[in-house]
């Protein structure tokens, strides 16, 4: 590979260096069963989750990762079970690759609510003049309150 000039190095850094992290919630249905779940009128199961987009300094998406869970119980009273239905990651950005799950998904009761964690591995395989992030493990940690509210963060 030919040596890069300073301007090219600056562009490459901006294109491949992680910047802002965007969090998107899964769309929530507005049907009657979801309303019943929200009002705590009956035991019910529903899906929830989040999708995270890791942006580069330049604004392009480096990679995405997600978590989808099923929440069962009577919100406001008791969450009986939470299980991970789907999790994973993907990238189509040059120099980045998705390496799979970092560990098995975990979900367990905490007090009156639940906690769920999934983790994914990404790698930036090319290093040019010191540019490259190496391997990154990213996580989605979610808490589910007795009300049924799902809150996700990127903390590992």
Predicted feature locations:
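Mature secreted bioactive peptide module from preproproteins
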Residues: 36-156
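N-terminal prepro-regions of secreted/extracellular proteins
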Residues: 1-55
